[in-house]
Amino acid sequence: MAALIHEARLFFIALQFFTRVPVPAWVGYTPEWMHASARHYPLVGAWVGGVAALVLWLAAQVWPLSVAVGLSMAATVWLTGGFHEDGLADTCDGLGGSVSRERALTIMKDSRLGSYGALGLVGVLGLKAVALYELTDFDGVQALIALVWAHAVSRAVPVALLRLLPYAGDAEHAKAKPMAQQVSDAGLAAALGWAALACAAAWGLGASAFTLACAALGVIALAAFCVRWYRQRLGGYTGDTLGAAQQLCELAAYLGWLAGVWFE
């Protein structure tokens, strides 16, 4: 029982870190718990995706699909405070030009939005909107399943990067020091377990094995790209690059899912 309560505490810590949702007072906080909470990132993603799916379904009863998709995306941005989108913009600004590692890290710490960051945000969010619109228009139920699945599985990717790459910045002055520490094998296994459970749930709800395979391959391909890109350019990861990886892999999930239902 104590172990289950502790895991619930870790989930709430992750939920509090990544969303605006208030958590019970008994949850508490320590840097060690914050670090260990990484195993539950996909579960937080499933919760966010569930909200997105609910908003999409409700909005589609009242407005055209394009408006419903926009409101669904806006709901997730509000719910998470644009946490991952901010990381995407900073990463695009830092790595968009041919600058040195040190210069890239300095640019990524700048709170101002540059041209590469703006282009990255518009490109990724625009493609997500188009993919979700086409998927919803093709099969609304598949779109709802895909939303929850993509939000969950894409959040397993930052956990993998925490395990596979070293921290590229100054760990002592990191905004979230626990994120500057490597995740254990057990933590990564737990996160991947949540991702596997998301796949099983999606299949049980009607997603085909072919569609899931297409979406999963998209996520894996983008995750592998991020690992290689971050290692070459920065020698590791930063908090911003983790957010960028989540956004890119979420987009890859939608595109893969759409390809799966389109060609099946």
Curated annotation (Swiss-Prot):
<feature type="transmembrane region" description="Helical">
    <location>
        <begin position="141"/>
        <end position="161"/>
    </location>
</feature>
<feature type="transmembrane region" description="Helical">
    <location>
        <begin position="183"/>
        <end position="203"/>
    </location>
</feature>
<keyword id="KW-0812">Transmembrane</keyword>
<comment type="pathway">
    <text>Cofactor biosynthesis; adenosylcobalamin biosynthesis; adenosylcobalamin from cob(II)yrinate a,c-diamide: step 7/7.</text>
</comment>
<keyword id="KW-0169">Cobalamin biosynthesis</keyword>
<dbReference type="Pfam" id="PF02654">
    <property type="entry name" value="CobS"/>
</dbReference>
<comment type="function">
    <text>Joins adenosylcobinamide-GDP and alpha-ribazole to generate adenosylcobalamin (Ado-cobalamin). Also synthesizes adenosylcobalamin 5'-phosphate from adenosylcobinamide-GDP and alpha-ribazole 5'-phosphate.</text>
</comment>
<keyword id="KW-0997">Cell inner membrane</keyword>
<dbReference type="GO" id="GO:0008818">
    <property type="term" value="F:cobalamin 5'-phosphate synthase activity"/>
</dbReference>
<feature type="transmembrane region" description="Helical">
    <location>
        <begin position="243"/>
        <end position="263"/>
    </location>
</feature>
<keyword id="KW-0460">Magnesium</keyword>
<feature type="transmembrane region" description="Helical">
    <location>
        <begin position="113"/>
        <end position="133"/>
    </location>
</feature>
<protein>
    <recommendedName>
        <fullName>Adenosylcobinamide-GDP ribazoletransferase</fullName>
        <ecNumber>2.7.8.26</ecNumber>
    </recommendedName>
</protein>
<dbReference type="GO" id="GO:0009236">
    <property type="term" value="P:cobalamin biosynthetic process"/>
</dbReference>
<comment type="similarity">
    <text>Belongs to the CobS family.</text>
</comment>
<feature type="transmembrane region" description="Helical">
    <location>
        <begin position="205"/>
        <end position="225"/>
    </location>
</feature>
<keyword id="KW-0472">Membrane</keyword>
<dbReference type="GO" id="GO:0051073">
    <property type="term" value="F:adenosylcobinamide-GDP ribazoletransferase activity"/>
</dbReference>
<keyword id="KW-0808">Transferase</keyword>
<keyword id="KW-1133">Transmembrane helix</keyword>
<keyword id="KW-1003">Cell membrane</keyword>
<dbReference type="GO" id="GO:0005886">
    <property type="term" value="C:plasma membrane"/>
</dbReference>
<dbReference type="InterPro" id="IPR003805">
    <property type="entry name" value="CobS"/>
</dbReference>
<feature type="transmembrane region" description="Helical">
    <location>
        <begin position="43"/>
        <end position="63"/>
    </location>
</feature>
<feature type="transmembrane region" description="Helical">
    <location>
        <begin position="10"/>
        <end position="30"/>
    </location>
</feature>
